[in-house]
UniProtKB/Swiss-Prot annotation:
UniProt entry tagged with the keyword Transit peptide: no
NCBIfam families xrefs: PRK00504.1, rpmG_bact
GO BP: any one term: translation
Highest taxon of the lineage: Bacteria
GO molecular function: structural constituent of ribosome
Recorded family membership: Belongs to the bacterial ribosomal protein bL33 family.
Cellular-component GO terms for this entry: cytoplasm; ribonucleoprotein complex; ribosome
Protein name: Large ribosomal subunit protein bL33
Entry-linked InterPro entries: Ribosomal_bL33, Ribosomal_bL33_sf, Ribosomal_zn-bd
């Protein structure tokens, strides 16, 4: 079974870290989702950060 790691999703506009997820450590590539940013007040791209 793959080890899980905690990742943070940061807004690509204001760089505010809004969401936390866990995923398998052996996953390749960075996660990018369109989520709501409380700081910007709209849906923006959120990209994975450590």
């Amino acid at each position: 079974m793959a080890e899980r790691v905690i990742i943070t999703l940061a807004c690509s506009v204001c760089k505010n870290r809004n969401y936390y997820f866990d995923r398998a450590k052996n996953h390749e590539g960075k996660l990018a989702l369109k989520k709501f940013c409380k700081n910007c007040g709209k849906r923006t791209d959120h990209k994975e950060t450590k």
